[in-house]
Amino acid sequence: MSSSSSSSPGDWITGSYTGNSAGVRITIATFLSVALYNVIELIVLIFFTFKRYQGSYFWSMLISSTGILPYSVGYLIKFFDLTSATWVPLTLLTVGWWTMVTGESFVLYSRLHLVLQNQRVLCLVKGMIIINIIILHVPTTVLTYTANFSNSPTSISGYNAMEKVQLTGFCIQEAIISGLYLWEINRILRLTADGASRNTILQLLVVNLACIFMDIALMIIEFMNFYIYETTLKATLYSIKLKLEIAVLGKLVDTAQRNVRKPPMFNAAAGQYPSFVDITNIGSDMNHAAPMRTDQYAASLEGIRFDVR
């Protein structure tokens, strides 16, 4: 694999890292090793959290988590020049990038189903994700292979520009989905009288804001042209965001279960429901948000293991 001639972590868009900085090499290895460790833990957590392995929430979580594996291995091979076959790391990191990034968006979309009942908004969100696959994933992939195989200044400049565009686009996409979720959670917070439920919702707000700040940090690093740091840190941050998703799921289930066990707090005639979340969607099809029905809560909770490890 070809390499650049300077030692700045902002270079090495093509080829391996051939600089003399031990710090950069340690940083690369650390970020990607943490990501790989988190992948193993995530897969175990997913299979122990979900009792029924179905629904878009389960599959998007599993696919996005698994995607971190080829993404991280691809960049390890690329930056440490572990093979002369350029296509091997490029293919691994590209497949991993597609599944990791868009998989995370589908995770957020699936979770949005738990609190948002507006079908028109949900369809628009799904359409946005699909459109961004076409306008962001496809051209970036083409430029990735073109830049690394041709190594021409024009193709490298094109890839460098597209890298910033796609990162910004996907960060905006995740911010929009998280924003809709935060909006609904905030509305629910004002309507929730139960103190424990309010505390849970506040924790969900903090988790979502933390994920947004992670995306902002990635964008700052990218626009500072620290390519090596941005691409390797991305794997770590996405693994952390997915682990936070597991925590969010646990909070949602705990709150729903607690409210189900409080019949005195429930008054269907007055329009009061035992939970702020349509928990039926967790263990079933997430493509269609069902109207909130109180008689479904107890049965639907069987679809989740409450002893998340």
Language-model-detected regions and their locations in the chain:
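Membrane-proximal first intracellular loop
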Residues: 1-133
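Extracellular loop 3-seventh transmembrane helix
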Residues: 22-35, 79, 87-101, 140-141, ...
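Alpha-helical transmembrane segments of polytopic integral membrane proteins
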Residues: 40-43, 105-109, 178-182, 245, ...
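Alpha-helical recognition domains of nuclear gene-regulatory proteins
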Residues: 46, 108-111, 115, 185-188, ...
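Intracellular signaling interfaces of 7-transmembrane GPCRs
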Residues: 53, 116-122, 181-202, 249-276
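A cytosolic-side transmembrane-helix exit/cap motif
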Residues: 108-115, 144-149, 247-259
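Membrane-proximal helix-loop-helix units in multi-pass membrane proteins
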Residues: 112, 116, 120-182
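Intrinsically disordered, Ser/Thr-rich cytosolic C-terminal tails of multi-pass membrane proteins
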Residues: 254-309
